[in-house]
Amino acid sequence: GGAGGRGLAGRYGRSPRPREQQRHRPYLPIREAEDLAAVIHAIGGEAAVVGHSSGAVLALFAAAEGVPMTHLFLSEPPFRFGEGEPSGDLPERLQSLIDDGHADEAVVLFQREAVGLPDPVIEQIRASPMFAALVPLAQSTVYDAVLTRAVSTPTAAMLGVEVPVTILRGEPTVPIL
């Protein structure tokens, strides 16, 4: 069973469009875990799961919630372990910027406060072609901020998952990763 060599990120990755049925419901990490469980069920009931950055936090959270996985690969999960936490109202401030039509400013705020990028790096990103691709995904910054606020330190259930876990950490990377 499992996904084998089929790439699912292109079909099931993040969309720049909000899910209409969830547009007015508050984001909850458990819904993301349920979505992942549905994707795994659709491909045969088991899969090795790879998550990068906040996706790694979500993947481990989902495993702790019982989502069936054969292996878990976590690339640079941004656990803070109680240190250097962003402001508790970051998700609300991000959502307010997006709701007011300032998705670009939400991306910048997220890069500054959640990721911890210095202003010169943010300005380089903003001046690059990559920035235009990030702006339509601004809503995901809210979700990332909610998730990493809820799980800034792995829970006992996350630490006790019973599938093999491989954690990848890059050497030249952002300090929180």
Question: What does each model-identified segment do?
Answer:
Residues 2-50:
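Active-site loop/oxyanion-hole signature of alpha/beta-hydrolase fold enzymes
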Residues 45-84:
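Conserved hydrolase catalytic core segment
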Residues 11-13, 52, 75, 168:
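The conserved SAM/SAH-binding core of class I Rossmann-like methyltransferase domains
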Residues 77, 81-129, 142-148:
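Helix-rich cap/lid subdomain of alpha/beta-hydrolase
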Residues 27-30, 67-68, 90-92:
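Short, hinge-like loop/turn segments at secondary-structure boundaries
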Residues 6, 65, 99-100:
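Charged, alpha-helical scaffolding/interaction elements associated with membrane systems
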Residues 130-177:
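Conserved serine/cysteine hydrolase catalytic core
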